[in-house]
Design a protein with these regions (language model features):
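PLP-dependent amino-acid enzyme catalytic core
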Residues: 3, 17-186
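Short, Lys/Arg-enriched N-terminal segments with co-localized hydrophobic residues
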Residues: 5-17
Length: 186
C-alpha cells in the first residue's frame, strides 16, 4: 500500500495502489477488480488486502454525521486501489442502498443505557446479507461492463443468502444467477 501526496498545497489526496494476497500464499497477487470477479484465490485461499489503510484521528472524526452511503464511500474507496473512480463508486453505492426501507440504511438504535442494536434488516429481502449483496452485485456488473464480459453465478444454500443474492443480481445486465436450495430444508 503506497500513498502519494498531491502537489496542491494544503490538500492531501492519496492515490492508493492496493493489492490483495491469498491467505494461503500460493496464488498471484491481484488488484481489486480481479479479486471481485475471482472470488476465491486459485490456491483455495481467500484474498485479503496486503496492507490495511490507516485513518488518522482527524479522518475518523470527519466520519461523524455522514450518511451510510457517504460513510461506505469514504471507508471503502482505499480498497479499490484506484481501479474504480470515486465518482462512479459513489453512484454505485448510492444505487445499492436506495432501495432500503430505512433512510439510515442500517440504523443504530439505542435500546437502553449504553445498549445499542444495529438494524441490518431494512434491505429488499429483510436479510442482513442485503447490506453486502446489493453492493457486490452492482460492483460486479460495473466491472464486467468495463471489461465487456458476462458472468454466470451458481450457488447452493439453505438460508437467506440465496434470496439476497437473487434479489441483488436480478435485472443486472452482465450477470445471470442460479441458486439451488435443498428440498424442504430451507
Amino acid at each position: 500500500l503506497r500513498f502519494f501526496e498531491d502537489s496542491a498545497p494544503n490538500r492531501r489526496r492519496a492515490r492508493i495502489f492496493m493489492r490483495y494476497v491469498s491467505t494461503r500464499g500460493e496464488a498471484p497477487d491481484l488488484g481489486f477488480c480481479d479479486v471481485l470477479l475471482a472470488g476465491l484465490a486459485r490456491d483455495g485461499g481467500l484474498y485479503v488486502p496486503a496492507e490495511w489503510p490507516l485513518l488518522s484521528p482527524e479522518e475518523i472524526r470527519a466520519l461523524r454525521g455522514l450518511s451510510y452511503p457517504e460513510l461506505a464511500v469514504r471507508l471503502l474507496t482505499p480498497f479499490l486501489g484506484g481501479e474504480i473512480d470515486e465518482r462512479t463508486f459513489a453512484r454505485i453505492v448510492r444505487e445499492s442502498y436506495a432501495g432500503f426501507r430505512h433512510d439510515a440504511v442500517c440504523p443504530l438504535v439505542q435500546t437502553g443505557a449504553n445498549e445499542f442494536v444495529l438494524e441490518l434488516f431494512h434491505g429488499p429481502t429483510l436479510a442482513f446479507k442485503d447490506v453486502a449483496m446489493q453492493l457486490l452485485a452492482r460492483l460486479m456488473d460495473h466491472v464486467l461492463a468495463e471489461r465487456g464480459q458476462r458472468a454466470t453465478i451458481a450457488g447452493a444454500t439453505s438460508g437467506d443468502t440465496g434470496g439476497a443474492a437473487i434479489e441483488a443480481f436480478a435485472g443486472r445486465d452482465r450477470t445471470d444467477i442460479f441458486i439451488l436450495f435443498p428440498h424442504g430444508r430451507v
